[in-house]
Amino acid sequence: MGIRKAYTKDMKFARALPAPSPRSETAKKVAWIYAAVLVIMVVGQLFSFEKFIPLIAGYWLPGGNGATTLLAGLIVVSEVFALPFLLRMPLSPLMRWFSLGCGLVAAVLWVILGVIAVVSDNAMTNSGILGTKVTVPSDGAQLLWAVVLGVLAVWSAWGLWPADRKK
């Protein structure tokens, strides 16, 4: 009987719970905007993923083709897994934190790639932010887009923070 009680107690943590209320309506709207931007980005990237990997390889990152493929996959997966947190779906507490982290990781990766594109002398015609079908030049425009993503990610994380807030 003791094992069953321990199992039941431990499995309550894995139960999907409704999202906590946002700090403000503005934060909720910012999260929806960030989610919409991520959906547009990930659809563009997944539409021709086999051509997205060479775009990421154009940043001349260390590690060769394996690291480039891993980074391209990490970018797309983090953008997809950020959506449940941003859309305030019922999630387990651990998944809510993971989804929050994915939203921040996606923005940070694009900021890092934007900085690399600006400081390197590599002449890329497409940054890959919107995949291969929509060309976003890899210069200051990409860095600006990435910084806007970062601001949206931090604002969403602050406004929808899943930890208990003291009122």
Language-model region placement:
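Solvent-exposed, well-ordered loop and adjacent helix/strand elements within mature globular domains
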Residues: M41-I75
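Extended, low-polarity transmembrane helix blocks
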Residues: M1-F47, G73, V77, P84-K167
